[in-house]
């Protein structure tokens, strides 16, 4: 309530998992993450990073496999932007097949960061984190390695974000059917 419309993140003491610092159970941190999410928190910061990276009591694995399974965008900094205006949406994604995968290209401003969404279906649920293939892309292209033996359909679209992380509308969706046979 008192955040002034700024993003507040909870600081969680990953160091408390250490025997010398409290010997907490992994469930203590997991319960705190769940609580923060239920309260509408914008994220968590873990102190100290070495305990996360060092996988103390399996914390890194728990975060990667349970809580932060999919890429996520950083929240917008709307209070810093005078206009709150989103950048123009990028142009349609163009897909070309290359050895080992697909090359995705689009047109957009060089001042933006891009988020690439995809689905292995004919439509994309932009509200689902599962649909984010990559975020924070600094160029207008991406290479997606794929299994050349599997026939599969893909749908792609891209959004642009300005320096305040305000996201544009999505580009038009591009449908691509990958086949091991040339068509």
Where do the model's predicted regions map?
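Extracellular low-complexity, O-glycosylation-prone stalks/linkers
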Residues: 111-131
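Pro/Thr/Ser/Gly-rich low-complexity, intrinsically disordered linker/stalk tracts
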Residues: 62-111, 164-183
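Active-site proximal loops enriched in glycine and acidic residues that flank catalytic Cys/His/Asp
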Residues: 12-14, 45-49, 106-108, 120, ...
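Beta-strand-rich modules
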Residues: 145-168
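Short beta-strand segments within Ig-like beta-sandwich modules, predominantly Fibronectin type-III
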Residues: 132-139
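Substrate-binding cleft of secreted/luminal carbohydrate-active enzymes
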Residues: 3-81
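Short strand-edge motifs at loop-to-beta-strand transitions and within beta-strands
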Residues: 140-144
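Flexible, glycine-rich phosphate/dinucleotide-binding loops
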Residues: 17, 53, 123-125, 167
């Amino acid at each position: 309530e008192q955040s002034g419309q700024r993003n507040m993140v909870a600081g969680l003491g990953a160091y408390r998992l250490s025997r010398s610092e409290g010997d907490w159970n992994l469930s203590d941190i997991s319960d705190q993450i769940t609580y923060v999410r239920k309260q509408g928190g914008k994220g968590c910061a873990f102190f100290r990073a070495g305990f996360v990276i060092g996988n103390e009591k399996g914390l890194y694995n728990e975060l990667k496999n349970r809580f932060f399974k999919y890429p996520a965008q950083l929240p917008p900094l709307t209070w810093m932007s005078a206009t709150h205006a989103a950048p123009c949406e990028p142009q349609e994604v163009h897909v070309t097949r290359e050895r080992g995968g697909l090359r995705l290209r689009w047109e957009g401003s060089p001042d933006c960061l891009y988020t690439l969404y995809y689905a292995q279906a004919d439509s994309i649920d932009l509200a689902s984190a599962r649909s984010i293939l990559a975020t924070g892309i600094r160029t207008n292209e991406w290479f997606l390695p794929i299994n050349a033996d599997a026939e599969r359909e893909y749908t792609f679209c891209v959004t642009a974000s300005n320096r305040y992380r305000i996201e544009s509308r999505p580009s038009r969706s591009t449908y691509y059917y990958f086949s091991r046979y040339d068509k």
